[in-house]
């Protein structure tokens, strides 16, 4: 039998096995409420939360985008690992505070917090719209990554479009049957699989390269720009490096499927362990494994074989391992993608249903009606993102970094200033956030970088300045909940 078909069989078998786990878990559950369906009743323990945090943060980007970035730009991309220390600290300090407030005041989203803190429905809707837009872009790209992985490892046994349909169908089943509790359980399994898979992929790449020392020696001789900043393409300038440390960590932490983990945590211990899991997993994946894979691509694969940098890992696996090992590694890549897809699909549907459609009715409809609407929205979000994925951009790395993360980072000023500064006003937060988003999209559409600084930096800091200045100058009284926060 064709090895491509066998490889596809391994992947489908994996997807079915995860579905069996979901069905078994779903049968044990009592009647679901919105809180249970979206946040697992705020009861995820200190074993499952770190694993679901790893799975949520490590998408198909770890297997496709990251090796592609190292292949294209070299070691400068390691700044991603360095910047994630900030994300871990945010989880510990900001995440625990919002967890306590959410337990006390019933928040299910960032929008709930902003509405309560500033007494502003506009901020809630704005936060929901920004979060949904950015997350759905990211979600569509996860479908792209999964489909590419299936298509490449199966040697074309399944078409790209068919692979999209498979990814959409299985993600719908996982989420609709399991809800947040099922997603967390699958995340725990898939986190272990993806970590083992990426290490195995690095080993496959290192063996024909002659080991770590020989790999770096050959790269230094053939493409020394890969081992220094700003990299082979000149991307990692001082200004871009600053963005990676300032804006990107906020954007990653404020991804709704990551931020919501704080609301799922059972206690402070669970949250602390999940914070520790972030740098450990980031170093293992991005500091070592994908670095070796990306650099090995320059030594082992001719440029003519690499149509897109995102495909360097699948190419290496097919070329330097047998079909079964390649299938297992790509199954791990798909595990990374499915775990993120599930979390993003769940949280996007939560934001659309609870913060937008049921904006004024959430407390006035029955639990059955709420769940019916929520499940319809899950289906609709998956369908829309699947359609987007059918005609994707050539590479999804820049879409993720330049739109999704930097757009979500604009939510940081109203959130953090509102939490730690009592004088922060509704008007200041509203104007700052609106201006930040407008500048981000305006500069991107126009393709301009004033004074050489990218638009997302202008948007982020003008957002902060406007929020602070208007709050200081305005005569608007404190929101009644300011003291609480």
What is the meaning of each model-derived region?
Residues 1-485:
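Membrane-embedded helix-loop-helix hairpins and adjacent transmembrane boundary segments
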């Amino acid at each position: 039998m064709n090895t491509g078909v066998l490889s596809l069989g391994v992947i489908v078998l994996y997807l079915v096995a995860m579905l069996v786990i979901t069905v078994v878990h779903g049968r044990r559950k009592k009647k679901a409420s919105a809180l249970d369906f979206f946040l697992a009743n705020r009861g995820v323990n200190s074993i499952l939360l770190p694993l679901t945090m790893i799975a949520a943060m490590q998408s198909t980007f770890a297997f496709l985008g990251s090796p592609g970035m190292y292949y294209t730009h070299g070691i400068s991309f390691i700044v991603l690992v360095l910047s994630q220390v900030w994300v871990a600290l945010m989880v510990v300090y900001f995440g625990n505070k919002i967890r306590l407030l959410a337990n006390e005041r019933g928040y299910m989203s960032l929008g709930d917090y902003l509405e309560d803190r500033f007494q502003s429905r506009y901020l809630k809707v704005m936060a929901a719209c920004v979060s949904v837009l950015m997350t759905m872009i990211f979600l569509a790209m996860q479908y792209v990554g999964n489909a590419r992985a299936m298509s490449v490892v199966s040697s074309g046994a399944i078409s790209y479009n068919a692979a999209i349909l498979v990814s959409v169908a299985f993600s719908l089943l996982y989420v609709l049957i399991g809800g947040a509790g099922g997603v967390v359980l699958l995340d725990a399994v898939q986190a272990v699989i993806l970590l083992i898979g990426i290490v195995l992929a690095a080993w496959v790449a290192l063996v024909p390269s002659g080991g770590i020392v020989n790999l770096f020696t050959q790269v230094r001789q053939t493409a020394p720009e890969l081992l220094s900043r700003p990299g082979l393409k000149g991307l990692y300038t001082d200004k871009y490096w600053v963005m990676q440390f300032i804006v990107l960590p906020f954007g990653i932490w404020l991804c709704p499927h990551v931020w919501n983990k704080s609301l799922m945590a059972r206690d402070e211990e669970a949250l602390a362990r999940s914070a520790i899991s972030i740098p450990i997993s980031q170093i293992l994946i991005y500091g070592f494994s994908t670095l070796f894979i990306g650099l090995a691509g320059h030594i082992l694969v001719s440029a003519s074989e690499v149509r897109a940098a995102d495909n360097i890992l699948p190419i290496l696996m097919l070329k330097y391992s047998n079909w079964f090992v390649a299938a297992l590694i790509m199954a791990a890549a798909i595990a990374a993608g499915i775990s993120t897809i599930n979390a993003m699909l769940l949280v996007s549907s939560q934001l659309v249903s609870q913060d937008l459609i049921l904006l004024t009715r959430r407390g006035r409809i029955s639990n059955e009606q709420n769940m019916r609407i929520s499940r319809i929205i899950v289906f609709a979000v998956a369908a829309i993102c699947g359609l987007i994925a059918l005609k994707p951009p050539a590479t999804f790395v820049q879409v993720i970094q330049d739109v999704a993360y930097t757009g979500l980072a604009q939510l940081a000023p109203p959130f953090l200033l509102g939490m730690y500064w009592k004088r922060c006003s509704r008007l200041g937060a509203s104007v700052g956030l609106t201006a930040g988003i407008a500048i981000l999209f305006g500069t991107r559409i126009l393709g301009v970088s004033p004074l050489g600084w990218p638009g997302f930096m202008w948007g982020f800091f003008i957002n902060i300045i406007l929020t602070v200045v208007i709050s200081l100058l305005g005569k608007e009284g404190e929101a009644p909940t300011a003291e609480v926060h």
